[in-house]
Amino acid sequence: MKFGYFDDRNKEYVITTPQTPLPWINYLGSEDFFSLVSNTAGGYSFYRDARMRRLTRYRYNNSPLDMDGHRIYINDGGTIWNPGWQPAKTELDSYTCRHGLGYTILQGEKNGIAAAQELFVPRGDACEIDRLTLENKTTAPRTLDVFSYVEFCLWDAMDDSSNFQRNFSTGEVEVVESAIYHKTEYRERRNHYAVFWANTPVTSFDTSRDAFCGVYGGPAAPEAVKAGHCSNSIVHGWAPVGAHHFHLTLAPGEKKSIIFGLGYIENPVREKFSAPGIINKARAEAMMARYATDAQVDAARRALADYWQELLSGWQLTSGEEKLDRMVSLWNQYQCMVTFNMSRSASYYESGIGRGMGFRDSCQDLLGFVHMIPSRARERILDIAATQFEDGSAYHQYQPLTKKGN
């Protein structure tokens, strides 16, 4: 069975069915912020360290697979579907997933409504941008209820998945207009928080998983999506989430976009609060302003494309064999850069919780990307050397955030 094909012109792998043998994932990010996204919009996000700065939860051994992720729901008169098929699993009239260089685009269509979900991590910012574009392809107006959904991790992914007696009482959020701030432990233990925002005024929102999904519900059919609205819940403890709801009407042939962002904000200790007990949102507000319009998002995508074009231009093969040229000139180099960023420390099989960066593996990985980005190779060599002891021994593996072994 054929599941997709290479689009050499656009430098993409195009997946033509959501039901691949296993989730097929792309790695977004090239600096400090990373997201894993599958061909059905599953995955998770983290800042630098998949254990110690995890923004969103992921259940690796869940059944069914790949239910956690970067979710968009569309309720069209009671028909609930996702642009990437999961988790609702409503049969789509058409589906494609385009895994590109640092971005993924999911395109789904159902009953004359087309939805494109475009995800990427921009250069120079610690955030993921998730742009949804809706189009009414029919000759009649269509009214839709559109929802976003992410489930926040309480930062330390190891503790988050084990210390439940404590974690069920620590979750804390704040909502300002269309921005949902996840600020668990910010007051006393941390100087960083996450923000999940939209550039469009919300109709309603939720921050409680129980309110959005239902105590006995789940991401396949959340109670809020079935009801057509959220309940404006403010969670205290339990499971904090971010969910936006928009009630939209599209005229025949009309297109509308909503820009979502998931960002990581770290404040200097002296600048943690803008007033007693009020988190300093200045950096978050500046980040949101940088991606408030389609023109700004388009510019960020072009900058990302230019970055990859420059990286790949130094080594190109013309052998007369199309498949060999494609592997050497594009996908092998892309994979080497992903390996440089991750060092196998985070995937759908390596949870990022226990392994960290391998000393030997990271040394070997240098051979694959040093020609593309020698300055970053030098940084990696110094990082690896910094974990060695005076007698020449070293940690077998270490956490990328702290450089401490585990």
Where are these regions (language model features)?
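Carbohydrate-binding/catalytic loop surfaces
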Residues: 347-356, 395-406
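Well-ordered alpha-helical scaffold segments within catalytic/enzyme domains
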Residues: 363-375
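Short, mixed-charge aromatic SLiMs
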Residues: 386-396
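Anionic coordination/interaction segments
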Residues: 1-360, 374-383, 387
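Short alpha-helix boundary/capping motifs
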Residues: 160, 174, 393-395, 405
